[in-house]
Swiss-Prot record:
InterPro entries: Ribosomal_L11_MeTrfase_PrmA (IPR050078), Ribosomal_PrmA_MeTrfase (IPR004498), SAM-dependent_MTases_sf (IPR029063). GO terms for molecular function: protein-lysine N-methyltransferase activity. This is Ribosomal protein L11 methyltransferase. It comes from Rhizobium etli (strain CIAT 652). It is found in: Cytoplasm. HAMAP family: Methyltr_PrmA. The gene is prmA. Gene3D superfamilies: Vaccinia Virus protein VP39 (3.40.50.150). GO terms for biological process: methylation. S-adenosyl-L-methionine binds at residues 136, 159, 181, 228.
Length: 292
């Protein structure tokens, strides 16, 4: 079944306002929302909400009602996102990525693994996380540092995507890892990648929006929490995330643009965590916190 995008084309400032409105409307429901810059010179942005075709009618009704109250002139547009075999489309040309001691590679590059590499095999697919994005590579670097230098007995990978970060933790240290994602496709892909890397017994995958699952209380609190999502939900979830962190635990956050880092640091400092370091990669940052 195809995915549908409903969106409004507007200015940057109004797109952010509409995004806030959509966040209020859908809260923790399983509908992705976001803003995208279309034309920098003309200040054209799009505020979007994504859903499966079967949910379009009820989502459209709720969005139209919300827009009437705050943005009566806004025109709601529609795009059908076709099903694409992303493995075939995006695998070609991807090269192995090194981050810390990790080598993230596709099945076509198994011969690139060298002695001493911690190899993680991930083929490009519908779930985010092949190591090529600056956020994933930054997380891998910090994971390598944290797991080597601190006592880590269990870990949470929140918004696991392809499962690459959960796999990295498990390959570094023989500890249990809970890997969750709001998207059931991502959860399925992560589970497949865990099996592909031969560590299925050590990683539990669950579909869960935010922290709304009994899995967190069953497996936590966690010595290490990794969340590579986006700045806005990271800021919103700061109190909940800190509540699931064990004493003397560590937090690794990414999906954060460089310009957004201070808001994220402020939110987690307010949750009584200590900012340790920030890693920069291609305009994105990965931020490491500890619980004092």
């Amino acid at each position: 079944m195809s995915e549908i995008r409903l969106y409004v084309s507007t200015t940057e400032s109004q797109a952010e306002q509409i995004l806030d409105l959509l966040s209020e409307v859908f809260g923790e429901e399983d509908f992705a929302i976001g803003t995208t810059e279309v034309d920098e010179k003309r200040d054209i942005w799009e505020a979007s909400v994504y859903m499966m075709a079967e949910d379009e009618a009820q989502v459209r009704s709720r969005v139209e009602t919300a827009l009437k109250s705050g943005f009566p002139d806004a025109q709601l547009l529609r795009e059908v996102i076709p099903d694409v075999d992303w493995v075939v489309k995006s695998l070609e040309g991807l090269k192995p990525v090194r981050a810390g001691r990790f080598l993230v590679h596709g099945s076509h590059d198994r011969d690139k693994v060298r002695p001493g590499d911690i190899a993680i095999e991930i083929d490009a697919g519908q779930a985010f996380g092949t190591g090529h994005h600056g956020t994933t590579a930054g997380c891998l670097e910090v994971i390598d540092r944290v797991v080597r230098s601190r006592r880590v007995r269990n870990a949470l990978d929140l918004g696991t995507g392809s499962g690459v970060l959960a796999i990295a933790v498990r390959k570094l240290k023989n500890i249990p890892v809970l890997a969750t994602d709001i998207d059931p496709i991502a959860t399925r892909v992560a589970a497949e990648n865990v099996r592909r890397n031969g560590i299925a017994s050590g990683i539990v995958t669950r579909t869960a929006p935010g922290f709304h699952s009994t899995a967190f209380s069953e497996h936590g609190p966690f010595d290490l929490i990794i969340a590579n999502i986006l700045a806005r939900p990271l800021i919103r979830m700061a109190p909940q995330l800190a509540a699931h962190l064990a004493p003397a635990g560590s937090v690794i956050l990414s999906g954060i643009l460089a310009a957004q880092r201070w808001k994220v640091i402020a939110a987690y400092s307010g949750a009584r965590l200590r900012h340790v370091r920030t890693i920069w990669r291609n305009g994105w940052v990965t931020i490491h916190f500890d619980r004092p």
